[in-house]
Amino acid sequence: MIGYLEGKILYRQGERIMILAGGVGYEVLLPSVVSASMTKGPGDETGLYIYFHQTEKQPKPVLIGFNSLEEREFFERFISVEAIGPIKAVSALCIPIGEIAAAIENKDSGALRKLKGIGARTADKIIATLRGKMAVFAGEHGGEPAGPAPVEENFHLLVLDVLVNQLGHKAAEAKELINQAIKRNPAISSPEELFDEVYRGETG
């Protein structure tokens, strides 16, 4: 299963992008909010975290791209709501995920109905299913558009990816381990130092 793609952009058309990686062109769907934050175009190098979707009813693999693990985790929770599949969710995520998360936590059905394809009944289902589970996204993003991570945060995301996808931590748990490590040692400046501090905290 594909979790991350990095390579050269062959083309962008609407909310579809094709990335050349390892000699293979991968077509990726981008939620509107992700597409709007991407400034790169054909010929540029880019990297996306991938949600891979394939079922008996949908045998053709669908790749959905995100700027960060946090965006992908939000998406995975969002599609846990009955009647919201991955393709519908791609269309619905047309505003920053922080704003959507805040609307869910504040039981703001009206704000959710502004999402493409989301009516009153579905908005109520979203709130009933996800309220109490999305505060971390509202707090982190604060309603601001998602964008490229600052340079100093790039290695944080690398460590987060390894903790979640290779070592089996849940995303929220891994994020907390990283935050605590940085609090203990604010001078951390590399992935190696961050890994050392994370596991020093776990064993200490």
Swiss-Prot record:
Keywords attached to this entry: Cytoplasm, DNA damage, DNA recombination, DNA repair, DNA-binding
Gene Ontology biological-process entries: DNA recombination; DNA repair
Region (Flexible linker): 146-156
Cellular localization per UniProt: Cytoplasm
Region Domain II, annotated ranges: 68-145
Region of interest (Domain III), ranges: 156-204
Region annotation (Domain I) ranges: 1-67
UniProt GO cellular component terms: cytoplasm; Holliday junction resolvase complex
Molecular function terms, GO-annotated: ATP binding; four-way junction DNA binding; four-way junction helicase activity
InterPro entries: DNA_helicase_Holl-junc_RuvA_I, NA-bd_OB-fold, RuvA, RuvA_2-like
TM region(s), chain numbering: none
Function (record text): The RuvA-RuvB-RuvC complex processes Holliday junction (HJ) DNA during genetic recombination and DNA repair, while the RuvA-RuvB complex plays an important role in the rescue of blocked DNA replication forks via replication fork reversal (RFR). RuvA specifically binds to HJ cruciform DNA, conferring on it an open structure. The RuvB hexamer acts as an ATP-dependent pump, pulling dsDNA into and through the RuvAB complex. HJ branch migration allows RuvC to scan DNA until it finds its consensus sequence, where it cleaves and resolves the cruciform DNA.
Complexes and interactors: Homotetramer. Forms an RuvA(8)-RuvB(12)-Holliday junction (HJ) complex. HJ DNA is sandwiched between 2 RuvA tetramers; dsDNA enters through RuvA and exits via RuvB. An RuvB hexamer assembles on each DNA strand where it exits the tetramer. Each RuvB hexamer is contacted by two RuvA subunits (via domain III) on 2 adjacent RuvB subunits; this complex drives branch migration. In the full resolvosome a probable DNA-RuvA(4)-RuvB(12)-RuvC(2) complex forms which resolves the HJ.
The family this protein is said to belong to: Belongs to the RuvA family.
Entry note about domains: Has three domains with a flexible linker between the domains II and III and assumes an 'L' shape. Domain III is highly mobile and contacts RuvB.
NCBIfam families for this protein: ruvA (TIGR00084)
Protein known as: Holliday junction branch migration complex subunit RuvA
Organism: Desulfatibacillum aliphaticivorans
Gene name of the encoded protein: ruvA
